[in-house]
């Protein structure tokens, strides 16, 4: 059992515990994978307007664990860290436990924003829409209304946004507990609260996201991490058919998570 993750130093020790464990079943998938580079030379430049996010963006790197830094798990309470360890062992045995995406349900938040697939952003009066290639997930960010007084929990929750200067601040609540924080299986409850801060940097060629996650049920403390999405006007999000879940079947024939 891992100790509770209460400080940055403790979180680093947890990461070392997972990455350097004598238990081969706890070996982690490599923490970072490069996804998108800059757009090819000659591509259409991004808008000079810092509030114009319209277009296709592609995450620059992908991480299995969405902790406060690369390869560091979220600050989970001990009982939920035990669940994460169990899921990692099952995956490494070749018998991964099911999650929402196993049967083509949405990935949920904040996990969806880590997907290594491109996103098309569309801006209209009162709303910003994220069209995700992965499983054709759609996020609607409302700019002209607050959260409803009562929310039925859903996979992607309810998102409202506002501009603070050149930064789009998105507040998401009303998430159900049927998904995970990240691809390794870090648990969250229906009390999870996600705040995203988006701003264009590097001459508008990069979209910076600072994500802050809180959950009083499963986490010992709030935590934040940063991601960069590349401006990719040369990319057109493709068809994604989740139901064809055997198209990448491994050689050992294991295609079903239990």
Language-model-detected regions and their locations in the chain:
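Bacterial N-terminal signal peptides
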Residues: 1-5
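PEST-like low-complexity, intrinsically disordered acidic/proline/serine-rich tracts
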Residues: 8-258
